[in-house]
Amino acid sequence: IQNPEPAVYQLKDPRSQDSTLCLFTDFDSQINVPKTMESGTFITDKTVLDMKAMDSKSNGAIAWSNQTSFTCQDIFKETNATYPSSDVPCDATLTEKSFETDMNLNFQNLSVMGLRILLLKVAGFNLLMTLRLWSS
């Protein structure tokens, strides 16, 4: 994702209507994240996520509370962030497919391990034969 816009995601616990968590991502490092709002609301300092595969960095902060009146818009209102629709449910079964392992990659890793073991055995055998030749 090139030049992502700052966004705030609100996550709610389906079993408890009191627990709410806000994830604030992709904001500029000059934006000041509020430290505390009220008792019962916890806000982390901003954290830099270094994504070396994409050669980019992303800032993130988390706020959570057990109060029913807690909303993400109140916490991060000065940040000019977008608030994606909360109508889309977070389904863990949809994300599992992207985390499946690749069979070819597993086979290649196994092949490399086998070749390393074979190389170690050959080097050990050569060393043993060389020492035996020197001793006689």
From Swiss-Prot:
<keyword id="KW-1064">Adaptive immunity</keyword>
<keyword id="KW-0391">Immunity</keyword>
<comment type="function">
    <text>Constant region of T cell receptor (TR) alpha chain. Alpha-beta T cell receptors are antigen specific receptors which are essential to the immune response and are present on the cell surface of T lymphocytes. Recognize peptide-major histocompatibility (MH) (pMH) complexes that are displayed by antigen presenting cells (APC), a prerequisite for efficient T cell adaptive immunity against pathogens.</text>
</comment>
<feature type="glycosylation site" description="N-linked (GlcNAc...) asparagine">
    <location>
        <position position="80"/>
    </location>
</feature>
<dbReference type="GO" id="GO:0002250">
    <property type="term" value="P:adaptive immune response"/>
</dbReference>
<dbReference type="GO" id="GO:0042101">
    <property type="term" value="C:T cell receptor complex"/>
</dbReference>
<keyword id="KW-1015">Disulfide bond</keyword>
<keyword id="KW-1133">Transmembrane helix</keyword>
<protein>
    <recommendedName>
        <fullName>T-cell receptor alpha chain constant</fullName>
    </recommendedName>
</protein>
<feature type="glycosylation site" description="N-linked (GlcNAc...) asparagine">
    <location>
        <position position="109"/>
    </location>
</feature>
<keyword id="KW-1279">T cell receptor</keyword>
<keyword id="KW-0472">Membrane</keyword>
<keyword id="KW-0325">Glycoprotein</keyword>
<feature type="region of interest" description="Connecting peptide">
    <location>
        <begin position="90"/>
        <end position="111"/>
    </location>
</feature>
<comment type="subunit">
    <text>Alpha-beta TR is a heterodimer composed of an alpha and beta chain; disulfide-linked. The alpha-beta TR is associated with the transmembrane signaling CD3 coreceptor proteins to form the TR-CD3 (TcR or TCR). The assembly of alpha-beta TR heterodimers with CD3 occurs in the endoplasmic reticulum where a single alpha-beta TR heterodimer associates with one CD3D-CD3E heterodimer, one CD3G-CD3E heterodimer and one CD247 homodimer forming a stable octameric structure. CD3D-CD3E and CD3G-CD3E heterodimers preferentially associate with TR alpha and TR beta chains, respectively.</text>
</comment>
<feature type="disulfide bond">
    <location>
        <begin position="22"/>
        <end position="72"/>
    </location>
</feature>
<feature type="transmembrane region" description="Helical">
    <location>
        <begin position="111"/>
        <end position="131"/>
    </location>
</feature>
<dbReference type="Pfam" id="PF09291">
    <property type="entry name" value="DUF1968"/>
</dbReference>
<feature type="glycosylation site" description="N-linked (GlcNAc...) asparagine">
    <location>
        <position position="66"/>
    </location>
</feature>
<keyword id="KW-0675">Receptor</keyword>
<keyword id="KW-1003">Cell membrane</keyword>
<feature type="domain" description="Ig-like C1-type">
    <location>
        <begin position="19"/>
        <end position="103"/>
    </location>
</feature>
<keyword id="KW-0812">Transmembrane</keyword>
<feature type="topological domain" description="Cytoplasmic">
    <location>
        <begin position="132"/>
        <end position="136"/>
    </location>
</feature>
<dbReference type="InterPro" id="IPR015370">
    <property type="entry name" value="TCR_alpha_C"/>
</dbReference>
<dbReference type="InterPro" id="IPR013783">
    <property type="entry name" value="Ig-like_fold"/>
</dbReference>
<dbReference type="InterPro" id="IPR036179">
    <property type="entry name" value="Ig-like_dom_sf"/>
</dbReference>
